[in-house]
């Protein structure tokens, strides 16, 4: 008997066993493979305030009911290059500008538009946060319901600069406002600006986020004079990259399909829950989990194969059974045992082997899973899946295991 060949054949057979229950026995291997399916007993969509912290772009204005209220932007206190002042002094971060030989002439904040050519009737404006001691915003938590509005009055209106390769939105910052950033008595200043827009009834504008990479990152430029001696004054500049940013958006009104199907959307803040009842079933003694597939079927026929969706087993006990809005995320995920999947041929299959193996070992029969879009999915796409009432495409859980 060629055991290497037999084990290879078994492995290939395991891969093919997906759609229905199978039982394979081999006198020499003494192994069998079983698949058991469970129906979803409950499913619903819920909404939380949208958070765009993972997006590669920033938005201002409004479009299709979305209101892009503000961009919150954090500047690095460290300069991109060090400027040598003397043997004992260099400029490498904000507070280093406080030197008797340094005079700040002007400060400019530039944001990079995605489009090369911009024609704007809107008015962009800039604020900052001189009286806020904390970090102002978090890309994972800040939204239109909890944003910090303790900002200054408008300190500048932006100008658009266009050259042959790019378009930029430029703000000029008076050095008096920049003093908060370089104050040596507050080395942990928030370093945050808020960029807003007026007269944007029909327009929205798209900028590169710091998440998009170094080649398109926006910058703060500090122009200053260095007085070396009575006869030598050097005019130069330092740049500081934007290291963190976030679009604050208000979502549009939902349509019926958003709430009657199992829907996920970044910009609408839509996520979905499903609950599986495995009743008294447990994996037979000595068996090994091969996979535990949670399967959904999309309603959207144009869903891209690149759409990545994440799923987590929830550890809470109470869940809504109808569409519900929350002011903040109300559930606790088992993050370490999460699963991600790509939509393929209108089907989405998560392997929740680790999460379910753990839950079943704890004698749990009800298992509730969350599904939500990955941070790099098109934020304005709503992906909808058939719910538990579908006669043919309802979601299901299918566990495959190997029994010696």
Can you say where each PLM-predicted feature lies in the sequence?
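Secreted, disulfide-rich extracellular signaling modules
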Residues: 2-7, 17-404
């Amino acid at each position: 008997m060629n055991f290497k060949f037999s084990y290879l054949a078994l492995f290939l057979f395991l891969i093919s066993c997906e759609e229905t229950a199978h039982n394979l026995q081999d006198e020499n291997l003494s192994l069998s493979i079983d698949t058991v399916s469970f129906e979803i007993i409950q499913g619903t969509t819920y909404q939380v305030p949208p958070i765009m912290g993972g997006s590669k772009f920033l938005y201002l204005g409004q479009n299709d009911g979305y209101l892009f209220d503000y961009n919150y932007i954090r500047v690095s206190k460290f300069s991109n290059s060090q400027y040598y002042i003397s043997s004992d002094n260099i400029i490498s971060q904000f507070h280093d500008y406080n030197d008797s030989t340094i005079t700040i002439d002007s400060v400019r904040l530039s944001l990079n538009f995605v489009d090369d050519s911009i024609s704007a009737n809107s008015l962009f404006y800039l604020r900052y946060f001189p009286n806020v001691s904390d970090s102002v915003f978090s890309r994972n938590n800040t939204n239109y319901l909890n944003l910090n509005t303790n900002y200054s009055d408008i300190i500048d209106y932006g100008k658009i600069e266009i050259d042959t390769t790019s378009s930029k939105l430029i703000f000029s910052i008076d050095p008096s406002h920049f003093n908060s950033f370089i104050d040596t008595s507050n080395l942990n200043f928030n370093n945050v600006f808020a960029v807003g827009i007026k007269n944007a009834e029909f327009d929205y504008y798209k900028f590169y986020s710091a998440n998009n990479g170094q080649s398109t990152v926006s910058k703060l430029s500090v122009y200053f004079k260095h007085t070396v001696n009575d006869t030598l004054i050097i005019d130069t500049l330092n740049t500081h990259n934007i290291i963190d940013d976030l679009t604050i958006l208000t979502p549009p009104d939902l349509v019926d399909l958003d709430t009657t199907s199992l829907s996920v959307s970044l910009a609408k803040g839509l996520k979905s829950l499903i609950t599986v009842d495995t009743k008294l079933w447990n994996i037979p003694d000595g068996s090994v989990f091969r996979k535990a597939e949670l399967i959904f079927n999309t309603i959207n026929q144009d869903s891209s194969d690149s759409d990545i969706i994440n799923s987590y087993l929830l550890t809470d006990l109470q869940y809504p059974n109808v569409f519900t809005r929350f002011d903040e995320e109300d559930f606790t995920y088992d993050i370490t045992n999460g699963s991600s999947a790509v939509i393929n041929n209108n089907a989405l299959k998560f392997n929740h082997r680790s999460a379910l193996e753990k839950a079943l070992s704890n004698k749990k029969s009800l298992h509730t899973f969350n599904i939500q879009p990955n941070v790099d999915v098109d934020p304005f796409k709503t992906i909808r899946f058939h719910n538990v009432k579908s006669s043919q495409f309802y979601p299901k859980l299918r566990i495959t295991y190997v029994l010696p």
